[in-house]
């Protein structure tokens, strides 16, 4: 089975799915193409858990979960986690790794819009990390995430800002110079300015709570969260 056999939905980019299908078998290789995701996952998890007031006992949805790096880590925190992705191969890898790790995660192959039509208002926390820049209609994803979270629940987004610096750092630097991710992973035209993301959020029941930047230091080869959202950034919102 491949991505083309997945349920039909307008908000799917099969070329984007194919990129991740091609390298799915190496999703949990700590030195492979997804090494940056493994490196930043503790920061993402810590931010989500802190801003959401902990994850234990909460029902969590990870939108665009891929091979399950974040989904598994949230399950280890005591959350009941569902992972959504349209890539068949990444989900197979995620399911196998969860089985081998003794971690319970419910992985589902469908779009967030399809999931929202069936599970509106059912989640305490919804995460959508590094996914918005890979779909044709990111605003539709934001809208669906808002529909899925309970009143008072938390929704987290992370993506890349669209400007010259982000192109230099995320495309030229990360893909061609440092070779941290495969060439062609990112398309700067699909990057999203914070004002654009906040505009979409404002058209839903979500309210902005906090925004932070994710920064890479090539000298120390380390990542940190902090002020400045000119490249990678994370947004915490809450359902009104």
UniProtKB/Swiss-Prot annotation:
Pathway: Cofactor biosynthesis; ubiquinone biosynthesis. InterPro entries: SAM-dependent_MTases_sf, UbiG_MeTrfase. It catalyses: a 3-demethylubiquinol + S-adenosyl-L-methionine = a ubiquinol + S-adenosyl-L-homocysteine + H(+); a 3-(all-trans-polyprenyl)benzene-1,2-diol + S-adenosyl-L-methionine = a 2-methoxy-6-(all-trans-polyprenyl)phenol + S-adenosyl-L-homocysteine + H(+). Keywords: Methyltransferase, S-adenosyl-L-methionine, Transferase, Ubiquinone biosynthesis. Its EC number is 2.1.1.222, 2.1.1.64. Pfam families: Methyltransf_23. GO terms for biological process: methylation. Transmembrane segments: none annotated. It comes from the Bacteria. S-adenosyl-L-methionine binds at residues 44, 64, 85, 129. GO terms for molecular function: 2-polyprenyl-6-hydroxyphenol methylase activity; 3-demethylubiquinol 3-O-methyltransferase activity; polyprenyldihydroxybenzoate methyltransferase activity. Belongs to the methyltransferase superfamily. UbiG/COQ3 family. HAMAP family: UbiG (MF_00472). O-methyltransferase that catalyzes the 2 O-methylation steps in the ubiquinone biosynthetic pathway. This is Ubiquinone biosynthesis O-methyltransferase. It comes from Escherichia coli O45:K1 (strain S88 / ExPEC).
